[in-house]
């Protein structure tokens, strides 16, 4: 029976909005052993527990899970896991004051890519190894939290008549529980990790980038783009694992998917602007971007983009032009791209007199014909100013390779 080992370093979420924030982190990762021999019905069962800590995240937890993997593809495996933890704010966000604590319950699904690794055949009891594995993951999931614990500095209650999530009075009060009006979060993310094996377990470290669609806090319930660094220890026990020769377990990285280092796309769709005017009208967005990548298949490159937002309620934010560093990562027909740089914004008519501002753009696309030079796609993206998500859009577009 052939089987593979690879590592994942997961997360939940973390606020990239202010780099000075420091939070406790949940990291969610899993192992997978797959690609069984033809005709074999035996599958390995991996039991794990672990605990982790990180800087830059509002979520911390311990979790336990069992993972049973069947043959998914030669590149990917999947894992469900349940996490129980906590979340708290370290800064005032809208109506939610500093020091609030949220118990959470979350379910996560990870799509794990190990096509870039040279998988080794190893003993069921993990030996010490001085080399570190490097990998990437894509993650999405949902967290649930219904109550929040006050720090004792503020008093709050749920106002059902006005529809407001909270009404806070600046009166000192003993710590107490209040109910959240939006007790859920959905997030999508990706990241990298280094994993170093020790006997019976693993130590892993790496960054994670995440987009949250709902923070669960009043007046702060729109898109948030986050970044975290995580450190994790994992204990592992494995059953029903058959050994195989190391040379039988090797998987080489796929060849290049595209002939060109150039990548570009155009799109048009409907979006909505948040934070500065949460009640603003839905707007039409047109975007074009181009990128030169060192690796034509996946990797880091440089590029520029242009946005036009047609919204009569926001005449001061009609056109943007920017340049920065881009990163693309493919998962089958899905691609996740991130760009960080600076942009100039102009008023109508277009006059780029504003100062350059830090911005980021995160996108998730489903490309119809990934290996074709030109292909239509459907996608979702957010554009942020100073790492605050200002705009979220669904769109139809076309890619060029």
Predicted regions and their residues:
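Outer-envelope beta-barrel architecture signal
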Residues: 43-49, 99-105, 152-158, 199-203, ...
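Solvent-exposed loop/turn segments connecting transmembrane beta-strands
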Residues: 134, 152, 216-221, 274-282, ...
């Amino acid at each position: 029976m052939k089987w593979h080992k690879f590592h994942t370093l997961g997360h939940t979420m973390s606020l990239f909005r202010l780099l000075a924030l420091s939070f406790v982190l949940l990291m969610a990762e899993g192992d997978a052993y797959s690609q069984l021999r033809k005709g074999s019905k035996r599958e390995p069962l991996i039991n794990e527990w672990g605990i982790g800590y990180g800087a830059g995240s509002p979520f911390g937890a311990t979790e336990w899970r069992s993972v049973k993997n069947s043959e998914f593809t030669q590149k990917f495996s999947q894992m469900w896991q349940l996490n129980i933890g906590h979340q708290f704010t370290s800064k005032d966000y809208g109506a939610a004051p500093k020091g609030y604590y949220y118990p959470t319950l979350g379910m996560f699904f990870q799509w794990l890519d190990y096509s870039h690794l040279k998988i080794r055949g190893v003993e069921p009891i993990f030996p010490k190894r001085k080399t570190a594995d490097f990998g990437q993951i894509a993650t999405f999931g949902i967290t649930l939290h219904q109550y929040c614990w006050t720090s004792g500095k503020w008093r709050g209650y749920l106002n059902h008549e006005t529809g407001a999530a909270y009404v806070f009075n600046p009166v000192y009060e003993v710590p107490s529980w209040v109910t959240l009006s939006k007790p859920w979060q959905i997030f999508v993310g990706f990241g990298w990790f280094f994993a170093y094996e020790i006997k019976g377990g693993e130590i892993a470290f790496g960054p994670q980038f995440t987009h949250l669609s709902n923070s669960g806090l009043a007046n702060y319930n729109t898109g948030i783009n986050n970044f975290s660094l995580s450190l994790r220890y994992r204990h592992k026990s494995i059953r029903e694992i058959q050994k195989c020769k190391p040379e039988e377990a090797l998987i080489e990285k796929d060849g290049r998917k595209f002939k060109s280092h150039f990548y570009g796309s155009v799109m048009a769709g409907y979006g909505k602007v948040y934070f500065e005017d949460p009640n603003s009208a839905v707007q039409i967005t047109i975007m074009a971007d181009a990128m030169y990548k060192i690796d034509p298949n996946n990797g880091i490159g440089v590029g520029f983009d242009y946005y036009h937002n047609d919204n009569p309620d926001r005449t001061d934010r009609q056109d943007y032009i920017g340049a920065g560093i881009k990163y693309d990562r493919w998962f089958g027909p899905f691609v996740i791209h991130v760009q960080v740089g600076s942009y100039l914004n102009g008023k109508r008519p277009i006059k780029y007199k504003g100062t350059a501002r830090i911005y980021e753009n995160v996108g998730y696309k489903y490309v119809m014909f990934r290996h074709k030079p030109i292909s239509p796609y459907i996608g979702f993206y957010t554009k942020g100013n100073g790492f605050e998500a200002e705009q979220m859009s669904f769109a139809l577009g076309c890619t060029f390779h």
